[in-house]
């Protein structure tokens, strides 16, 4: 199964990388989500808040090398959002659910007016 990596950027939240499978299922790089939601220890907090069936490990190229990282599905993303203590988590959820995911479902990619 081939996955396409997409990077989307938000002025407030920064970068979040996702992999979209051939059948259109998005998997979010857990560290990106955890960092944007204010978690202090990404791997530990992902394992604590995301059910095993909602996370997997995958290889991600970080610019220098390929590294194994935790990926979370949409359900895992919501678990991290709902467990975050940051006020901005609600805005992050609205951005992802109102803009990013609908765009992926419509176009197979995250599209903005700038693209």
Set out the residue ranges of the language-model regions.
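An anion-engaging/catalytic patch
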Residues: 1-115
């Amino acid at each position: 199964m081939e996955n396409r990596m997409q990077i989307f950027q938000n002025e407030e939240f920064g970068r979040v990388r996702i992999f979209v499978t051939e059948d259109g299922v998005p998997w979010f790089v857990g560290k990106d989500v955890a960092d944007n939601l204010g978690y202090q220890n990404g791997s530990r907090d992902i394992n604590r808040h995301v059910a095993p069936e909602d996370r997997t490990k995958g290889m991600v190229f970080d610019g220098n090398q390929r590294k194994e990282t935790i990926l979370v599905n949409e359900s895992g993303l919501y678990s991290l959002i709902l467990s975050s203590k940051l006020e901005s988590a609600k805005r992050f959820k609205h951005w992802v659910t109102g803009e990013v995911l609908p765009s992926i479902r419509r176009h197979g990619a995250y599209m903005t007016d700038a693209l």
